[in-house]
């Protein structure tokens, strides 16, 4: 893998264009539109640089240059493995680890490794027990911001993203994108062992385990094995009797979210919650 240069980093490319300036009699401020800067679009204000296209402000020319690629569509860093291009070097380096298998970020508690530091920081909350995100509606706390956001939507019941093919609605755009693969027939995940293809990454990973060591999560009570930790957690409730989901209509408790959702659907007149 190697980056395409396209004049970046030299005095002849996009960088030199953005450095064009005009000094005004008022406050000095660099402004740049997506078509590239000109004497009519660049104004200086000390060490502050502003993008005329979206209003973003930067304290360095280099940051403005890098930001401009969002508007111009310039992606000078191309992966030789998959052909995907990226506007910034940092974005180019991260996907490289997918191809190389490099995972430089290691958890000091258990030794688990990750290809991104952000993934490691999220994972460490499992060991610390930290749950910094609290729902103002019900007081429930969460370790991960993504899970917290997903939970908040359950209070509003709003599903903003609708499928144009079948009309089904979703809380998140990512869920709609995933659903659309059903209509397009897209199966981007291919098993390198047997060649089988899958629509969803989660199903692909589960299939991949059939070629490896099997089910790494084992119940200490009965010895049953599971592919995922959350499956083991759910199974453990059959031994402990824990029922964390409560129906407010009948004050009935459920051990599984699927059973709780089905009961809630009855009360809502058949509408998915």
UniProtKB/Swiss-Prot annotation:
Recorded GO CC terms: nucleus
ZnF locations on chain (C2H2-type): 49-71, 77-99, 105-127, 133-155, 161-183, 189-211, 217-239
An example molecular function term from Gene Ontology annotations: RNA polymerase II transcription regulatory region sequence-specific DNA binding
Location (main, coarse): nucleus
GO process annotations (BP): regulation of transcription by RNA polymerase II
Any coiled-coil regions, as ranges: none
Record InterPro entries: Znf_C2H2_sf, Znf_C2H2_type
Origin superkingdom: Eukaryota
Record localization: Nucleus
Alphabetic keyword roster: DNA-binding, Metal-binding, Nucleus, Repeat, Transcription, Transcription regulation, Zinc, Zinc-finger
Family note: Belongs to the krueppel C2H2-type zinc-finger protein family.
PANTHER family assigned: GASTRULA ZINC FINGER PROTEIN XLCGF26.1-LIKE-RELATED, ZINC FINGER AND BTB DOMAIN-CONTAINING
Primary role: May be involved in transcriptional regulation.
Protein name, as recorded: Zinc finger protein 80
Species this protein is from: Homo sapiens
């Amino acid at each position: 893998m190697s980056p395409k240069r396209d004049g970046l980093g030299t005095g002849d490319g996009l960088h030199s264009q953005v450095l064009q300036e005009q000094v005004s009699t008022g406050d000095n401020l660099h402004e740049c539109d997506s078509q590239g800067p000109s004497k009519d679009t660049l104004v200086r204000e000390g060490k502050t640089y502003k993008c005329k296209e979206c209003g973003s402000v930067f304290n360095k020319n280099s940051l403005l240059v890098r930001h401009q690629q969002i508007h111009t569509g310039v992606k000078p860093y191309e992966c030789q493995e998959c052909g995907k291009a990226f506007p910034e070097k940092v974005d180019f380096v991260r996907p490289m680890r997918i191809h190389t298998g490099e995972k430089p970020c290691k958890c000091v508690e258990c030794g688990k490794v990750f290809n991104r530091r952000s993934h490691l920081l999220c994972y460490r909350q499992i060991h610390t027990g930290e749950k910094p995100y609290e729902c103002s509606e019900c007081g429930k706390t969460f370790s991960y911001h993504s899970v917290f956001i997903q939970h908040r939507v359950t209070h509003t019941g709003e599903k903003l993203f609708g499928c144009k093919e079948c009309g089904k609605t979703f809380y998140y755009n990512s869920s709609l994108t995933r659903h659309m693969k059903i209509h397009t027939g897209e199966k981007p995940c291919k098993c390198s062992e047997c060649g089988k293809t899958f629509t969803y990454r989660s199903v692909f990973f589960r299939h991949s385990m059939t070629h490896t060591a099997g089910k790494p999560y084992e119940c200490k009570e009965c010895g049953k094995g599971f592919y995922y930790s959350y499956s083991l957690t759910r199974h453990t409730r059959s031994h402990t009797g824990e029922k964390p989901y409560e129906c407010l209509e009948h004050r009935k408790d459920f051990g599984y979210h699927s059973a709780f959702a089905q009961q809630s659907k009855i009360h809502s007149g058949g509408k998915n919650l």
